[in-house]
Amino acid sequence: MKKILLSIFFSVTLLSAVFAQESWQKVKIYSNDLKSDIAMLRKVGVTIDEGFTGKDNSISVFLPASDVEKLRSTGIRFDVVISDWDAYYKSLPVLSPEEQLAVRQQSKQTYGVEGLTYGTMGGFYTLAEIYAQLDSMRARFPNLITQKVAIGTTLENRPIYAVKISDNPDATENEPRALYTALIHAREPAGMMTVIYYMYYLLENYNTDNAVKYLVDNREIWFIPCINPDGYEYNRSTNPNGGGLWRKNRSLNSGAYGVDLNRNFGPYSYWNSPNGGSSTVASDIDYRGPSEFSERETQAIKNFAVGKNFKTALNYHTFSNLLIYPYGCWTYLPPDSATFIEYASDMVAMNGYSPGTSWQLLYPVRGSSDDYMYDGDPEGTGKVFAMTPEVGGDSDDFWPPQSRIFPLAIENLRPNLYYTWVAGDYVSLASYQLNKQYISPGDQVQMNLTMKNKGLSNAENITVTLESLSGLMTVSNGTVNVPLVTSRGTYTTTSPLTFTIAFNAPIDTLVKARIVTSKNGVMMSADTLGFITGVPTFVFKDTTDNPLLNWTVTATPSTPKWEATTTDFHSGPTSFTDSKSGNYANNATVTMATTNPISLVGYSNPKLSFWTKWSTESDYDCGVLMISTNNGSTWTALAGSLTKPASGLGKQTPAGMPVYEGVSSNWKQEQISLSAYANQSIKLKFELRSDVGLVADGWYVDDIGIMVYSAVPVELVSFTGNISGGMVNLDWSTATELNNRGFEVQRSLNGSEWFTAGFIECAGTKTSSTNYHFSEQVAGTGTIQYRLKQIDFDGTYKFHGPVNIESDVVLSYDLMQNYPNPFNPETVIRFNTASDGNVSINVYDILGNKVSTLVNGFMKAGGHQVSFKPEGLTSGIYFYEMVTPGFSKKLKMLYLK
């Protein structure tokens, strides 16, 4: 399971006369039964809150030095990792002024942010410096941010300040509202620096970034950078250079200082939930207070939020690289869990955090700000999609080194922007449909889109544009307007986008494009698409609904194991998953390997393709796809477009091995080239690996196949002919076509000489059936043969036919127009004779001079044709004349040299 932050502090009752903080140690406690040992520690006065669980059945926690001796008395094995936290923190590297300047310059160059500086408390801002930053923002950007507004006052008479960023900051507008808070726990300043960095990003990029301008103009974005001023100032008084570990506020209860503000929110049923997610002992660090909203700070947040109708909120904490959503107080998901999961999945894809509820990822929590904001006061605050980012990894602790301040803020920049977007309208591509199953060179393709408004407000007047990212693709109709997409709804376009693949596009080539969604010229989202040219032929394809038919399944422990499920799939009715009912097991290895070898002999560039989704513990659990060329004796992990390098922790070993890990909640197609294994016999294996700790839903795969992409031949499925009303009618059809320039229709009256009767142009490449028709006057009596010369754009050709037409038509004398006309270098002249006799056909120039004799002699009755290929003649108009006893006719033709 995910690195779980559990900080175990032994409860030390702080009498009112005691103000000094003890030194702290970081210890690593080893446990064979985590739940049992935690229960035992609670009995001796241990409070469980924030810390870090290792993958060797250990918990790394901070303890007061005096409590380390108490730990020894329990008999639980432990190691001291940091013997003196204060000394350790003071020994952390400090950035020089030159190094600080370089970091800030890089921030300005890459993200346009230069306002964030380093504070004087270990690089973090003190409370006074936070207030000064808010004043500076107002002075620099008076038209974008309000003056700081006191929304409440603490017990020690310190104001709790909020500010709003918007295009009319001093006015209240009917715009979607988003909220960002930090420092509800006094020892977590990295969240505050992350929030202030985002504020500067909005302010300093307003005039240069259209998306930022749109958000500021169309949202009211509120910030409370420090909810707990008294606790934060107390840390400054004890540790002026940073590193203070005081967590709560400074109210006095039963002789002990402090209430955990993130356990003090209502309503009563949430605050007093039976899950034990807070302490009732005043000296404990997660003490919930004497009643819900007993503290001035939580009262201030409640009063501030009432009537604001916030749509989204991020309440920043540290640390553990998590994104936590409701419920914490109940061990079931909220009614809007699908929305929370979608938002969280999108956001963690940007920074690699792990999403889930507190009881899924950490421990039960009751009285939290997220639960209250979501549905704790529907009449007052409405429904706020509130979540908690836990910023920073294990080595960052509560006070990260100076070198980590900017990176932590930057890794949350895109999630912050996303959550401001979805407070209002935010439309992106949900899916697309093509009018062709496969795409080949020369294809003209139509695309219809299904767009989803992930936002919490209706989206109107949206523009969707198809952009080519390849020189092999030309967009002909690339824009569609979407009039309205309701909040959380979808819209399917009715007017298709169209594009053409170049005739010279190589087979088996990835052609990329992207769908850009915008409003008023401002890009909301961009989704990249890829199409592989050619038609796949499957070397191996699993079309079964039972993995045991093609795969050998093993599992340690014996269950759960790979099975078919009907509850989630890419193409129905099933997909394969490692844990059909619920989560995968701890310390599990679950494999699915092809039973029989797959031959790739004769294929130069085979591709493995499958659809997949997964949810595993980041950095520790994973899915691994492997290949073997020796019948399974040894296996090699395959890297794909969706894999990540293994962390080297837990079951993600060795480090750097390609794995599927973290969360990818939507079905995605994975395609992996197997060209390195061409002309060999292979086996494939899907393997889910987990260590001891967090468990999750696991790995899903569907539509597994190995394919080769090839050209589509011109496949003629029929070719027929008949005579009707003195006309020859030819009909033929194709099943598929590739690079087909057209069909030249050829005729023969004697079975040996072939003449062109006409030409039918084609459209290049088609993967669906096409019908063709050609007709002409009957050219003679007896057997007339026709054939088709199919010509590609590269000049190559292939003959189809012939078909025989039996003609008993009685012909009259006639001379027909030459074909082709104009012509160069040769043309064909057809003529009919009604009876046996002498015939002459001569060619004359425009002055009447005879330049060629084509026919001069006895001809049988019937249809005839003769070719004319000028030699030594100039371009121009020529006449040809047929003369027989009792018949003559002259026609004109054009020779273009």
Regions found by a protein language model. Give the residues of each.
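Intrinsically disordered, low-complexity Pro/Gly/Ser/Thr-rich segments with frequent PxxP/GP/PP motifs
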Residues: T474-A505
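Glycine-centered coil/turn sites that cap beta-strands in beta-rich domains
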Residues: L600-S609, W614, E715-G742, G801-Y844, ...
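Extracellular glycan-recognition surfaces and repeat-rich motifs
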Residues: V539-T589, A639-K668, G837
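Exoplasmic/lumenal beta-rich domain surfaces
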Residues: T629-A676, G751-H773
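Terminal connector regions
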Residues: L497-P536
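Metallocarboxypeptidase
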Residues: K26-K28, R236-L434, V475
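Short, surface-exposed loop/turn motifs with a glycine/proline- and acidic-biased composition
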Residues: E761-Y786, V855-P885, K890
